[in-house]
Each structure stands twice: as structure tokens, then as C-alpha cells.
Amino acid sequence: MNTLPATISQAAKPCLSPVAVWQMLLTRLLEQHYGLTLNDTPFSDETVIKEHIDAGITLADAVNFLVEKYELVRIDHRGFSWQQQSPYISVVDILRARRSTGLLKTNVK
């Protein structure tokens, strides 16, 4: 009987820290939806991100707090709508950011 070594492709990939994941997602969300960089916000400091994570604050709540505090306007909403468009980040926005940064793998073909 021949035996083959077990290979696990994920074992070779380093696991990102929660702070690194937040940095990637914040960078994408802020740039795409508000035209900001991470350095334009308090989240340029890793300690601030860690404090939010430790306090159990979600990424969406953290971004939406900035939106409310600084009255940010989304730059990705174009055109006229009969409904007022929300300036806030949604779960769908975060999922799209996860996919575009490679943090969410989909097997849909």
C-alpha cells in the first residue's frame, strides 16, 4: 500500500491578525466609499484598531461612527434616486471588500 503525505494548502498561508484584517478592510472601504486613506482617520494607529476589537465593536459600527461624527458622504453613490441614499456602510459593503481584498474566498464559477 502506498501512502502519500498529507498536504494542506492553508497550512502554508500565514494567518492574518485581526488588526491586519481590519487595516485591509478599512483601507478598502474608506478609499472606495469615502475617498479617504487610513491615515485620514484615527485608525492609522494600530492601537485604536485593537481597542475597538477588544471592546467588541464591529467594523461596520466603527466606520459608521466616523461617518456620523464627520458627516461623511459616500462618493460611490451616483445619480438621482427617489430615495435618499444612506451614507453608512452595510454588511454587503463589507462582504464585497472582503472579496476584493482576497479575504473571502468564493467557489462560485
Swiss-Prot record:
Pfam families: CbtA_toxin. Disruption phenotype: Single deletion leads to an approximately 100-fold reduction in resistance to oxidative stress, deletion of 3 type IV toxin genes (cbtA, ykfI, ypfJ) leads to a slight reduction in resistance to oxidative stress, has no effect on cell growth. It comes from the Bacteria. Induction: Expressed in mid-log phase at lower levels than toxin relE. Keywords: Toxin-antitoxin system. Toxic component of a type IV toxin-antitoxin (TA) system. Acts as a dual toxin inhibitor that blocks cell division and cell elongation in genetically separable interactions with FtsZ and MreB. Overexpression results in inhibition of growth in liquid cultures. Overexpression leads to formation of lemon-shaped cells; inactivated by overexpression of cognate antitoxin YfjZ but not when the 2 genes are coexpressed from the same plasmid. Also neutralized by overexpression of non-cognate antitoxins YafW and CbeA. Encoded in prophage CP4-57. Interacts with FtsZ but not MreB. Another group finds interaction with FtsZ and MreB. This is Toxin YpjF. The gene is ypjF.
